[in-house]
Regions:
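C-terminal capping/extension of enzyme domains
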Residues: 113-146
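A structural signal for short, hydrophobic/glycine-enriched beta-strand patches
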Residues: 2-121
Length: 146
């Protein structure tokens, strides 16, 4: 995401954040603190990073992100969604629901080695993808309740 931010273009290729214990050596209390540190160390200005650290699942991420941007009176025209490749469709679905006028660039990352080509070849990949399917059904029902 920081690379895309710096280049201000999306060409469909992004290497993702590689875990580097010599660069990211702090104790992080939340995922947001870690990701903020990654972005700052990769050239994204701190004032350009919005804080949302209350969500416990993806649909809440979208809801709370919307609250943060509304509170800051920001009209989001374009946004980058950077997430695991098998999670990208569900993530996009939620953010499109909460930000219907926004153009999204989805930047999938194969951070855990699970790809479109190999997910069905091992138990870890199968569990990750079928877990996504289960969460789509469960969280979609929550969306309908709202």
């Amino acid at each position: 995401a920081s690379d895309v931010y710096k280049r201000q273009v999306v060409n469909g290729k992004f290497s993702g954040v590689l875990e580097k214990s010599n660069v990211y050596d702090k104790e992080y209390g939340t995922e947001w603190e870690f990701l903020r540190d990654v972005l700052i160390k990769n050239g994204v200005p701190d004032q350009k990073i919005l804080k949302e650290d209350q969500a416990t699942f993806t649909y809440e991420n979208a809801i709370y992100s919307r609250q943060v941007t509304d509170h800051a009176e920001l009209e989001i025209e374009r946004a980058i969604l950077c997430c695991k490749s098998y999670h990208a469709r569900r993530c996009l679905m939620y953010y499109q629901l909460l930000y219907p006028k926004t153009e999204f660039y989805v930047v999938p990352v194969n951070a855990d080695g699970i790809t479109r080509e190999n997910w069905k070849k091992n138990e870890e990949g199968i569990d990750a993808v079928t877990g996504e399917l289960s969460r789509i059904v469960k969280q979609f029902s929550l969306m309908l309740e709202r």
